Amino acid sequence: MNHYEFVQTDSIHFLKEWPKDEKIDVVFVDDWHSYPHVKKQLELLDQLVGPSSIILLHDLMYGNTDPFYHADLSHAGPQWDEGGPYRAVAELNPQFWEWSTLPWNNRLTILRKKYSNKYHRR
């Protein structure tokens, strides 16, 4: 009996194909880092996670060894366009999302959707 499945594929396609009635417990996002791409991933994940799900994102503090978020990474190339993954996460509504970043090795962010009677069924 498998309790996990490792899948290596295009993330947008994968998330679009995932059954909406099957919640994802843990997902690790370390993909193309442009703002539009990460924003789309988070929009799709919004439908697939609940308050007990965890989304792990890599590289929100990418760019140097200091533990600071970077919204402008135009110097880093097109993969970081328009603010990169930090901007996509920073724009999430804090009423419905909470997150924290561990400041080591380009940083690991833990993102969780908060429970809301308005938007979630138990």
Task: Label the model's feature ranges.
Residues 1-122:
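S-adenosylmethionine/decaboxylated-SAM
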